[in-house]
Structures are given as structure tokens and as C-alpha cells.
């Protein structure tokens, strides 16, 4: 299912919410009616939480079906909550807190910012149980903001080159394409939320943008 709505009253749904094929993690202050929309669209249960006491969950964590890597400032009660959900939890070493902004991952691979240390890369590799590749994309290090990826496909910044798209295909093991959401927004990772069952994009997204999202994320294969 593909929905066009501003869940958090602005286009940046990927900054506030985290989703995998198993669950969605949403801020405590998100209205129950919005939580229900997420659950219906992504076909998962949603849990209300925070990271480091903050509602920017999508920016401060990255997850797949195998685990979750979070900001080093995560609170003990938050770690306990994730562990009780059956998640393998690890904090990223170093000074970088916005893990979700600098890592894009599915169950096959992850692309991370090149400034992450070897230690941080190893934590991501072990926790998410994936192969990790470090690189910049479209001249930027905010990989997680540039890419929305699931186990069925990926959508990345419209300025990505063919070589970069091919690189992402190799790492993630799925097909994908470039595009925008929200009437021209290139930071598709920040302004969309997706798993293998569905996606939510900014309310302002146009028909052609929706069609590209549907194709890039592999939903046409379900028709």
C-alpha cells in the first residue's frame, strides 16, 4: 500500500519514524489515528518510544530485521524496551548521534558515510548482520537521508549517477531507481517511510512521484 500524507504535520516522516518489515517505532506524542495509518500501510505493529529521550527516532537509529543501531546517548530504559521486543541492540561508537541520517540498510547490506570509524562499521555489520560499504553519494555523506531502502527495492536522491545506483543495487541486492517526493524533495530518506509491504510519502507528492516510488520500491511486482 502506498499513502500520501504528512504523518508528523511536515514532510520529514523519515526523521521521526523508523520501520522494518517487523515493526514501526513512532514517537510517544504521535496521535493514535496516525499510528493506525502507519500500521495499516506497512502491515506491522507500531510501538511508541524515543531515542535519547528525543522523538527524532528515524534520525537517531537504523534498523533491519536483525537488529537496531542507535545513538550512543540512548537511555537504558529505551534499550530495555527494544530488547524486550526481541531486537539485537547496539550503540554506535564515536561522536556521531544521527545514525539514521548516515546509514541506509536492509536485510542484505548497508551503505554508510565514509567518516564512520572501522569500529562503528563493525558494530553496524555485526548488529544488522549485513555487508557494509562506506561511500559518499551525490557528493554528500548523509546516506540515510538520501535513500529509502527495503527488502524489495530502493529509492534514492534524483541526482545520483547511474554508477551510484548500480552500486546501491549491488549492496542492497534489490532493484531501485532515483526520484523525489513532496513535489521535488531529493532527500527521499528523510521524507518517506517504507518497508516491503508499503510506503508513506509526503502529502505534497505528485502523481508521477508516486508512480516512481511504487516502481522503485518494487510494489508493481505485487500487482
UniProtKB/Swiss-Prot annotation:
Q: Which GO terms describe its biological process?
A: cytosolic ribosome assembly
Q: Which GO terms describe its molecular function?
A: ribosome binding; translation initiation factor activity
Key words, A-Z: Initiation factor, Protein biosynthesis
Q: Which family does it belong to?
A: Belongs to the eIF-6 family.
User: What name has this protein been given in UniProt?
Assistant: Translation initiation factor 6
What functional role does this protein have?
Binds to the 50S ribosomal subunit and prevents its association with the 30S ribosomal subunit to form the 70S initiation complex.
Provenance organism: Methanobrevibacter smithii (strain ATCC 35061 / DSM 861 / OCM 144 / PS)
HAMAP family recorded: eIF_6
Q: Which NCBIfam families match?
A: eIF-6, PRK04046.2-5
In terms of InterPro entries, this protein maps to: eIF6 (IPR002769)
**Keyword flag Amino-acid biosynthesis:** no
List the Pfam families. Answer: eIF-6
Q: Known PANTHER family for this protein?
A: TRANSLATION INITIATION FACTOR 6 (PTHR10784)
Top-level taxon in the UniProt lineage: Archaea
Amino acid at each position: 500500500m502506498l499513502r500520501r500524507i504528512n504523518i508528523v504535520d511536515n514532510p520529514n516522516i523519515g526523521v521521526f519514524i523508523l520501520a522494518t518489515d517487523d515493526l514501526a517505532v513512532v514517537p510517544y506524542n504521535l496521535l493514535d489515528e496516525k499510528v493506525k495509518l502507519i500500521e495499516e500501510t506497512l502491515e506491522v505493529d507500531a510501538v511508541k518510544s524515543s531515542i535519547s529521550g528525543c522523538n527524532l527516532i528515524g534520525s537517531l537509529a537504523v534498523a533491519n530485521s536483525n537488529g537496531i543501531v542507535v545513538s550512543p546517548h540512548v537511555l537504558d530504559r529505551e534499550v530495555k524496551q527494544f530488547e524486550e521486543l526481541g531486537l539485537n541492540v547496539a550503540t554506535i561508537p564515536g561522536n556521531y548521534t544521527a545514525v539514521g541520517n548516515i546509514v541506509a540498510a536492509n536485510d542484505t547490506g548497508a551503505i554508510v558515510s565514509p567518516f564512520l570509524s572501522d569500529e562503528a562499521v563493525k558494530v553496524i555489520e555485526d548488529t544488522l548482520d549485513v555487508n557494509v560499504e562506506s561511500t559518499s553519494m551525490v557528493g554528500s555523506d548523509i546516506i540515510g537521508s538520501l535513500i529509502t531502502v527495503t527488502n524489495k527495492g530502493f529509492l534514492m536522491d534524483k541526482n545520483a549517477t547511474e554508477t551510484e545506483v548500480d552500486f546501491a543495487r549491488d549492496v542492497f541486492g534489490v532493484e531501485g531507481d532515483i526520484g523525489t517526493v513532496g513535489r521535488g524533495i531529493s532527500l527521499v530518506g528523510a521524507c518517506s517511510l517504507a518497508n516491503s509491504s508499503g510506503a508513506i510519502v509526503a502529502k505534497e507528492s505528485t502523481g508521477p512521484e508516486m508512480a516512481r516510488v511504487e516502481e522503485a520500491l518494487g510494489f508493481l511486482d505485487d500487482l
